[in-house]
C-alpha cells in the first residue's frame, strides 16, 4: 500500500491549476504534512519535459496527428508516474499533479474525437489503472479561461484551440464528474482568492474524513 497520497488538479486552460497546486501544497504544510512535491503532466522529468515541448510547440512544417498527440501524452505520463510519482508515494511523499488521466479523456476524446476505449486501454495497459486519491476539478467557462490567458507572452499549441474545442473538453469533464468517484468540482469562474478558499475548505474536509 502506498504511503503517500496522490492529488490531482484538472481543468481547462485559464482555470488556475498551477496556482491551486501551490495553494494545496501550502495547506498541507500548515496541516503538518510537509513532505509534498508538485509535478506537471506532461513534464517534471527530463525526458517528459522534452515530450512536453513537442506537444505544446506548433510545427509550421508538419501537422501533429491526433493519435500521435495521444501517444506522446502517454509516453510523458508513463515517465512521470514510473520515475517520479510512484517512487515518491512509496517513500511517503505526497504528490500534487497539474493534470493526469482525466485530461486525456477530456482533451483527446472530447476534443480530438479519439475513441474513449483507446484511452482506457492505454491507461490499463501501461499504468494499471493507477488512480489519484482525490481530484480537484476547477470548472471555468472557455470565455473566462481563454480571456485569462490571452495576455501571456506566448500562447502554446494547445491553448490555440477554438472556443468550440474547449467547450467540448469542459462538457466532458462535467460528464466525468457524474460517473467517476473522488472528484471535487470547484467553481473557478470566480476571483482566485475565492477559488483558493473553496479548495482549502474541501481539502481540510477530505483530510478530516480520511483521518489524516
UniProtKB/Swiss-Prot annotation:
GO terms for biological process: dTDP biosynthetic process; dTTP biosynthetic process; dUDP biosynthetic process. SUPFAM superfamilies: P-loop containing nucleoside triphosphate hydrolases. GO terms for cellular component: cytosol. Phosphorylation of dTMP to form dTDP in both de novo and salvage pathways of dTTP synthesis. This is Thymidylate kinase. InterPro entries: P-loop_NTPase, Thymidylate_kin-like_dom, Thymidylate_kin_CS, Thymidylate_kinase. Pfam families: Thymidylate_kin. Belongs to the thymidylate kinase family. It comes from Buchnera aphidicola subsp. Baizongia pistaciae (strain Bp). Keywords: ATP-binding, Kinase, Nucleotide biosynthesis, Nucleotide-binding, Transferase. The keyword Transferase applies. The keyword Metal-binding does not apply. GO terms for molecular function: ATP binding; dTMP kinase activity. Signal peptide: none annotated. ATP binds at residues 11-18. Its EC number is 2.7.4.9. It catalyses: dTMP + ATP = dTDP + ADP. Coiled coil: none annotated.
